[in-house]
C-alpha cells in the first residue's frame, strides 16, 4: 500500500528498558542492527500496526509495554534504486514512518524473537540511547536521528542508584557473616525453554551488563539482492 507520492506507510519502535537503554535487533543472518519496524496494513491505525509489529518482531504484548510518546508527523526516507525490487521501481520511493517510544514493563525474558514463524532478528541487545548510527543502513540514518531527537525529551527520569554504596554494604554483610562473596549468577534470568533462531545470541543479564559501544558491533554489509526496505 503506497501513498500518492510512492511512500509506504510504516511504523518504527524505540523500546526502552528501565535504565533508558534502547533495544537493538540484529537482522536475521546479517550483521545489520536496527530498531523494530514494519508496514501498516490496509485498515490498520499506526498504533494497531505498532502493537502487531511489536509482537511479531519482539514477542511483546500491549500490557507488557507503556506507550510514552510518538512523533507528531510522518518521517520519510527514500530508498536507492539498487535496494528496490525491479518490479517496484518507478512507483515505490521509500517509507514514511510514525515512530513510537515505548518502555518495557516486564522482564528481559519476556522478549521472544520467535513469536512467529518468520523472525526478523536472530539476536538482540540493550544499548545507550545516543550511539553512533554507523551500523544502520545509510539511507535510514537521517530518520533514526530525527526520531531519536524528537522523542528524547520524553525519556523517563529516574534516580541514579549509588551502586558503589550498595556494593560496599553487600561486601560488609558477607564479611560480617564470615561468608565469601559469591559471584553473581544470571542463569535464573533466562526463561526455561526460551528459544532463539539458529545462530542467535542472548545476553543473559543485559539490564545489568555494561553494553559495548554500538560502533564496535559488525558493520553493515551491502545486501546481495535488492530488498523492499
From Swiss-Prot:
Protein name: RNA pyrophosphohydrolase
Cofactors required: a divalent metal cation
Pro residues composition-biased segments: 220-229
EC number: 3.6.1.-
Motif (Nudix box): 38-59
Pfam families found in the cross-reference section: NUDIX (PF00293)
Keywords: Hydrolase
Keyword check for Hydrolase: yes
Domain Nudix hydrolase as annotated: residue spans: 6-149
Transmembrane regions: none
Biased composition (Polar residues): 177-188
Native source species: Acidovorax sp. (strain JS42)
